[in-house]
Amino acid sequence: MLKSILIILLILQTFEKSDVYFTKEISSHKMVEMLQKLNLNLQGNVGLKIHSGETNGKYFLKPDFLQEIYDYTKGTFIECNTAYSSRRSSSSGHKQLLEDNGWTKNNRRIVIMDENPDDDIELTVKNPQKINHNYVGGKIKDFNSIVVLSHFKGHQMGGFGGALKQLSIGFASQKGKTVIHTAGQYTDWSHAMRDAANQEDFTASMADAASTIVDYFPKGQIGYISVLANISTSCDCAGASAPAPRIKDIGILASTDPVAIDKAGLDLIRSNVDEGTNAFLSQVTNLKGENTVTVAERIGIGSQDYNLITVEGNSDGNNGDNNDGDIDDNDDDDILNFSGCKIMKLSSALIALMILIL
């Protein structure tokens, strides 16, 4: 009897999918609506993880675009310093850049979590694949809930950048970034480029690091919103040198599953054939970008199987007030089922069912 119950539970678990909400409308108001779909329990101090952009950067999510979600959550924008040489590699330079890029306008609250490197805290990777520990800024302790706001785009080192990249490199302190880039071999940034890990180990290390942030915050108190607009092949850290987007704006995704939302972003780009699609996907493949998604699923922080649930946009097809790309107005089904490993999971379910019958 117990065996039968366990196998039935296995079958049911096999068919569980994460919900990913999708809208073609890209607007400040829609960001709030997408967050509401997640039914999060945002308690206490809410951190809104952003990318501050670089000098003269064009494509990062602008603070004015995020104003409504900032007001709705009564949150605080949070960022971390870079390890590579830039204005963001020092807290003083980073603060000036934040001001230049408009983040402090209207007395918006913004915190650099690793402002003081001596306050870094060590987080243990519970199911390590490449690294055993991650290091993040000590001010993470000041926040009870997190909304990860990601500009989904390419990345010249990780293949692409979305929720998992924000959770890993985005949250890591300078010490943590070094650990990720060297797959746990070093904590001193001077080794990061000279002794950088191979792509497979680097992308796996990002998944490990991402898991520490997911584990740090209680379930229901962390969610993810990704904006698929201005989809350059380079990260927002490229600043003014980022190549112009060659993929049309697609929309906004929201989920409580960082693996599912990144997988959905990649799937939408695959299905949205534009002149820049092949170049984007080739970069993801060449840099083993999807390995981060695969390893993150293996660790257990999310699933590549998801339901894509369409949230209707404005009837006139308005794509918002801070983006230049066009969005296709074709109607979608309310729920589309996608699966990164559906065949394997279906096989597992059938095997379990056969055992139950026999």
Where are these regions (language model features)?
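C-terminal helix/juxtamembrane-tail motif
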Residues: 309-317, 349-358
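Proteolytic processing junctions in secreted/extracellular precursors
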Residues: 8-16, 338-343
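Cleavable N-terminal signal peptides of Sec/SRP-targeted secreted and luminal proteins
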Residues: 2-13, 347-357
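Intrinsic disorder/low-complexity segments
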Residues: 1, 320, 327, 344-345
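Intrinsically disordered, low-complexity segments enriched in Ser/Pro/Gly/Ala and basic residues
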Residues: 3, 17, 314, 338, ...
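Ser/Thr/Gly/Pro-rich low-complexity, disordered linker/stalk segments of secreted
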Residues: 316-334
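Extended, low-polarity segments enriched in aliphatic/aromatic residues
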Residues: 15-72, 76-320
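C-terminal GPI-anchoring signal of eukaryotic secretory precursors
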Residues: 329-347
